[in-house]
């Protein structure tokens, strides 16, 4: 069964397409993977459900060991005045940098990673997670799609990052 063939994909289909402007390649495990800007995911959730705290929210807890911090995230969203959710989704991050100093951003990094994984279960950036960003033709299609109407197949209004950078540089 493909997306769009049943009403069960109503969130997935709105959130599956990724604007390439919010991605970047990074090397890992001997190949190049695609990473997604986490704030673009927050923007997408806001476009889908409304402001954080009102239309969607997350709850997180941390567990610390001598070397690591574990973040557990529960994601919730409102649909027709009913809250839905799932989780916890977990992630772990080292508390110390390679030079031995404390990484004071470790909890934030673990939370961000858990949110990204959790958002993927709703369908956010599904094209990246399904490996479609390994295909240059697909990326070109997404660039065209997002440059044409700003929101691809979705009802989510995506802000053009190039325009944001230009506006910021003009100030």
Predicted regions and their residues:
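Intrinsically disordered, low-complexity regions
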Residues: 6-15, 23, 45, 136, ...
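Interfaces that engage single-stranded nucleic acids at replication/repair/recombination sites
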Residues: 1-6, 139-171
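N-terminal, Lys/Arg- and Ser/Thr-rich interaction peptides
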Residues: 1-38
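Positively charged, aromatic-enriched nucleic acid-contacting surfaces
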Residues: 29, 36-145
